[in-house]
């Protein structure tokens, strides 16, 4: 998978509005999993990826954020 945070756009509502993640969101999150640690190092993305909403979304999708 190419690392592109835009790919995670289906997760935006789940992350920002605290709604359950869609199947599309979980699929993209799993695809982008190898990229998540890189996003955490990016000052523009860090606040989104490390937010409680993002962590909850990842957890709901069964994706562990371990960097």
UniProtKB/Swiss-Prot annotation:
Pfam families assigned to the protein according to its UniProt record, in alphabetical order: Tryp_alpha_amyl (PF00234)
Alphabetized SUPFAM superfamilies for the sequence: Bifunctional inhibitor/lipid-transfer protein/seed storage 2S albumin
Temperature dependence per UniProt: Stable up to 90 degrees Celsius.
Record-level GO BP terms: lipid transport
Annotated organism of origin: Apium graveolens var. rapaceum
UniProt similarity note: Belongs to the plant LTP family.
Entry's pH dependence statement: Stable at pH 3.
Name recorded for this polypeptide: Non-specific lipid-transfer protein 2
